[in-house]
Amino acid sequence: VIYHWLKIKLSEFRLPLQKLNNQTIIKMALEITDQNFEELVMKSDKPVLVDFWAEWCGPCRVVGPVVDELAAEYGDKAVIGKCNVDHNPGIPTQFGIRNIPTLLFFKNGELVDKQVGAAPKSILADKINAHL
């Protein structure tokens, strides 16, 4: 009963679900912080998408679930993360981020693309695919 209730509640949030060893898990974007940015983003050998967002930002709340869906779909092919700009001011300052949501795309430690403002999932997927 609890499983079905949880499944219904999660579907309301459109969180991506995956099966692992016959157990349903939620695959979401990684939390990117000032402390782990270098390791997870700059040293990654995979394409990386980082969504810079804040809790109070309306458009960020639209983009957030899309980023989680991309994390589920790309799995181990790309690193998909989110950075809360209120909790981690260093990275946004380093990259001159003044508007949110801003999504930065990295490959081999280099910034290769940028999306400022909300964008459809297909646009973000195209930008990731260009660097796979």
Predicted segment positions?
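A short beta-strand-turn-helix
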Residues: L30-V48, P89
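Conserved helix-turn-beta segment immediately C-terminal to the redox Cys motif
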Residues: D45-P47, G64-C83
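Conserved redox-active cysteine motifs that mediate thiol-disulfide chemistry
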Residues: F52-V66
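Structural microenvironment flanking redox-active thiols in thiol-disulfide oxidoreductases
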Residues: V85-T93
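Non-catalytic, surface beta->alpha helical segment in thiol-disulfide oxidoreductase systems
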Residues: F105-L132
